[in-house]
Amino acid sequence: MARPKNKEELLQQATENFDKLMTLFNNLSDEEKRGTFPFETRDKNCRDTFAHLYEWHQLFINWERDNSNGQAKPFLPAPYNWKNYPDMNIKFWEKHQTTSLETAVTQLEKSHQDCLQIIETYTDEELFTKKYYNWTGSTSLGSYAVSATSSHYDWALKTIRKYKKSLK
């Protein structure tokens, strides 16, 4: 699927990919939902995958809120940057090892809605014009929104499909 280029496409892809993800998950048996992926090195189950998505939603939500309120903050919290962010993902994984699957699902569903609500408040121009906001650096707000939602859901879909295929 092509990367969204406007607000309508972004909202549509984010919603469709999220719905596909949740349908795929909901069609697993209870045992399969709690099963271990035989192939991942970091995210080892559905809970880990959902917690990862939730944490990236939080990055987007907090970054947008702070910057739109005049508090200049980078997308990735210190001490992380785009060279070492895999270390941050490991910290997210560690943080959620005691999170229940049910909590991970609930958090993800809410944070998904929160992201959509944020996206809704912006125009196409505000979302997809590079450097429209100085706090987006050389890219656009929409690019960050795509990364936090639709493209990340695509990754999660591929991960859980791969897991489902391994069950056969």
Where is each model-derived feature located?
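A short, mixed-charge helix-start or loop-turn motif at secondary-structure junctions
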Residues: 3-7, 93-98, 138-142
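Short amphipathic alpha-helical segments with heptad-repeat character
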Residues: 8-15, 50, 54, 102-105, ...
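Short, contiguous alpha-helical
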Residues: 36-87, 121, 127-168
